[in-house]
């Protein structure tokens, strides 16, 4: 079966504080979309490229200042946009991102940098067709981090995650949809899939009826 092409492609960004379930949802959505013949690519930010790797190394040690982190994040994102996001959207694929520019706005904003300036710095980044914000209280996010066998880093404190959550919720982006991620993974997936299908219904039109029927099944 040939992959179904979506006119102009589709960009799905999954956001939320640490422990919200972003990676799980990204994988589940990709599996479902691929299963009905939609070419789907999953990526993440920071990426595995040189700038993203540098940032993750810094996150473990906390040696970068917020301003330095912004510089590295923007370099990583520009490369991501140029090398993967724009080309894949251009060929009609669904691109699912596990974190995108709203994470930088929330986390660096929580560190004290101006939110408006952070948004402006990301003006080059294509806006998502749907931005799925998985909302959980910090206590639940931290509990999930411990339960998966990880140790919270210097970003992952109740106070910092609370500030990040507030910024995420306050961001005024037209494609943002908030999902209660305190629910189980199946419920979150169902809600997210419904929101993705709304966009697909418009993009695919009558030609996508079969695809949408399979997704709903």
Curated annotation (Swiss-Prot):
It catalyses: dTMP + ATP = dTDP + ADP. ATP binds at residues 16-23. GO terms for cellular component: cytosol. GO terms for molecular function: ATP binding; dTMP kinase activity. Its EC number is 2.7.4.9. Keywords: ATP-binding, Kinase, Nucleotide biosynthesis, Nucleotide-binding, Transferase. It comes from the Bacteria. Transmembrane segments: none annotated. GO terms for biological process: dTDP biosynthetic process; dTTP biosynthetic process; dUDP biosynthetic process. Belongs to the thymidylate kinase family. HAMAP family: Thymidylate_kinase. PANTHER family: THYMIDYLATE KINASE, UMP-CMP KINASE 2, MITOCHONDRIAL. Phosphorylation of dTMP to form dTDP in both de novo and salvage pathways of dTTP synthesis. This is Thymidylate kinase. The gene is tmk.
């Amino acid at each position: 079966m040939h992959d179904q092409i979506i006119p102009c492609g589709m960009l799905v960004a999954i956001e939320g504080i640490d422990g919200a379930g972003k990676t799980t949802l990204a994988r589940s959505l990709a599996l479902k979309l691929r299963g009905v013949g939609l070419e789907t690519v999953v990526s993440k930010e920071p990426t595995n490229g040189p700038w993203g790797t540098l940032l993750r190394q810094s996150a473990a040690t906390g040696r970068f200042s917020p301003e330095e982190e912004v510089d590295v994040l923007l370099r990583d994102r520009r490369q991501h946009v140029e090398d993967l996001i724009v080309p894949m959207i251009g060929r009609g694929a669904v691109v699912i991102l596990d974190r995108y520019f709203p994470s930088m706005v929330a986390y660096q904003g929580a560190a004290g940098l101006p939110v408006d300036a952070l948004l402006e710095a990301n003006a080059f980044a294509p806006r998502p067709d749907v931005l799925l914000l998985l909302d959980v209280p910090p206590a639940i996010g931290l509990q999930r981090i411990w339960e998966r066998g990880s140790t919270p880093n210097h970003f992952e404190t109740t106070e910092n995650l609370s500030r990040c959550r507030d910024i995420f919720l306050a961001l005024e982006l037209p494609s943002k949809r908030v999902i209660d991620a305190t629910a189980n993974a199946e419920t979150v997936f169902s809600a997210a899939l419904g929101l993705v299908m709304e966009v697909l219904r418009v993009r695919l039109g009558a030609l996508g009826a079969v695809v949408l029927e399979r997704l709903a099944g």
